[in-house]
Design a protein with these regions (language model features):
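C-terminal motif of bacterial Sec signal peptides marking the signal peptidase cleavage site
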Residues: 10-12
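Bacterial signal peptide processing site
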Residues: 14-17
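Beta-propeller domain segments
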Residues: 37-86, 218-220, 230, 235-240, ...
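A short beta-strand motif characteristic of beta-propeller blades
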Residues: 91-96, 137-143, 185-193, 241-246, ...
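Beta-rich, blade/repeat-based domains predominating
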Residues: 97-109, 143-159, 163, 193-211, ...
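Residue position within the beta-strands of beta-propeller blades
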Residues: 113-115, 162-163, 213-215, 265-268, ...
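Acidic carboxylate motifs that coordinate Ca2+ or other divalent cations, activating on Asp/Glu
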Residues: 131
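Asp-box/WD-like beta-propeller blade repeats and closely related beta-sheet repeat scaffolds
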Residues: 136-154, 165-207, 215-218, 241
């Protein structure tokens, strides 16, 4: 598999206190700053962006290597950590001392919601004084509000929605509301839990607010399953009109709409135990085909093309489902196998200076940022970083680049002090990145 390397990005910032955090208030516009002026700054080294292109033609045969089971050895944050980002970017610790922070959502009032999924808690945070550190922190919802491994969060139709592992719930919401009330109304029942980490359920509102898109991962590695497993479907905000958008997606997690085209995209964790080089995770658009049928992306019968048959799903040397195998769509951007691609967000198109803060250079506008949580099913560890996938004219170019790296200490272990999960572009043009292992949120900003 050929890999070329390109990197771009990261800044982070953090705040902890033994005293109760102040209530969230309206944020002041942040002022542009040199990285040396930023509070909670993380030391950085310059990373030179280089394209990484994984193609179907480069893939090895199944079982070309052993399938290792090497989960990471997660260590504490170093006393003097150093992260690598492209020139001109700075990193701060935006928030610290968190319990397994996973997913992020921007509330209508500008505050940031954080799903600490394993704690069945959603926090509400904000950088009220605009210095790049979230000093305001309060509890927005807990298990008492019906949370059960919450992840995706969305706002639509004057309401707040959360994706639990077993359902999607709707709650009354008013901008600026500091805490959810009640246990909400279930608008979609879902199959709960799943294989390894496949309990995550993302929920995102369409740009027009008329639909909610929901992701559901598989329950197994490669066993055939009934929908809605391994699919993305959509419903109206009141739960009606369920329609499968795409399926054969082993574990779709990240979900976002391109800012220029409105096309939905998802990140997918592909299957295990075929060797180090199979199967690449990916970023792809989703939707209906020319016949109005949901697109099929291969799982569990094929991978990436109709010709790549999974050897575990054969019958007499042929695919168990030749009808579906023939429909397999090739994804837009392939990632190195076992990277564990999770969080996804697009940088706005036509972004300019916002509130006096320098936004990212034009080459990032309309492109996708993806968090790689990192491998467990590979001899040499991979992932543990944030990548950037360039787009041109609203379409993926086909390669990706490293944007924020430095967490992975030793790939042979692997040993790491960071497992990025969620990403969120803020109105000021900076990027937030959740790091689950050591309980931080990093902020990446462009300081020129």
């Amino acid at each position: 598999m050929r890999l070329l390397l390109l990197s771009v990005f990261l800044a982070a910032c953090s705040a902890t206190s033994s005293a109760p955090a102040p209530a969230v208030t309206a944020a002041a516009p942040p002022a542009a700053a040199d990285s040396t002026d930023l509070p909670n700054a993380v030391a950085t080294e310059t990373l030179t962006p280089t394209p990484i292109r994984v193609t179907v033609d480069d893939l090895p045969e199944p079982y070309a290597s052993e399938s290792a089971r090497k989960g990471p050895d997660v260590v504490d944050v170093p006393a003097s950590p150093v992260l690598r980002v492209p020139a001109g970017f700075a990193v701060q610790v935006w928030a610290d001392g968190l319990d397994s922070p996973r997913w992020l959502a921007l509330a209508p009032d500008g505050s940031v919601l954080l799903a600490a999924s394993r704690e069945n808690t959603i926090l509400r945070l904000q950088d009220a004084d605009g210095d790049g550190v979230a000093e305001a922190r309060e509890t927005f919802a807990t298990a008492a509000n019906g949370l059960d491994l919450p992840m995706g969060m969305a706002f639509a139709d004057g309401a707040f929605f959360v994706g639990n592992t077993g359902d999607v719930r709707r709650y009354p919401y008013a901008p600026g509301q500091g805490r959810l009330e009640g246990t909400g109304t279930v608008v979609a029942e879902l199959p709960g839990r799943g294989y390894n980490q496949h309990w995550t359920r993302n929920v995102v509102a369409s740009p027009d607010g008329d639909s909610l898109y929901v992701t559901v991962g598989s329950e197994t590695n490669v066993d055939p399953e009934e929908l809605p497993r391994a699919s993305v479907f959509r419903i109206t905000p009141d739960g009606a009109g369920r329609q499968t958008v795409s399926f054969g997606l082993r574990n779709p997690v990240g979900l976002a709409f391109h800012p220029a085209t409105g096309t939905p995209y998802t990140t997918v964790n592909e299957r295990d135990l075929l060797g180090d080089g199979l199967v690449p995770d990916y970023l792809t658009s989703i939707g209906l085909d020319a016949d109005g049928e949901p697109r099929f992306y291969g799982w569990p019968y094929t991978y990436l093309t109709p010709d790549n048959l999974d050897p575990r799903r054969l019958d007499g040397g042929r695919s168990e489902r030749p009808d579906l195998a023939a429909r397999t769509v090739t994804p837009d951007v392939l990632f190195e196998s076992h990277s564990a691609a999770l969080g996804l967000d697009f940088y706005p198109t036509g972004a300019t200076r916002a509130g006096g803060a320098a936004t990212f250079p034009a080459r990032y506008h309309g492109g996708a940022f993806v968090a790689f949580r990192g491998s467990w099913n590979r001899d040499e560890g991979t992932g543990y970083k944030v990548a950037f996938a360039p787009f041109e004219d609203g379409r993926a170019v086909g390669h990706y680049e490293d944007f924020l790296t430095g967490f992975l200490v030793d790939p042979s272990g692997p040993t790491t002090w960071g497992r990025p999960v969620g990403v969120l572009v803020l109105p000021d043009g900076s990027l937030l990145v959740t790091e689950e292992a050591n309980g931080r949120i990093y902020r990446v900003s462009y300081v020129g």
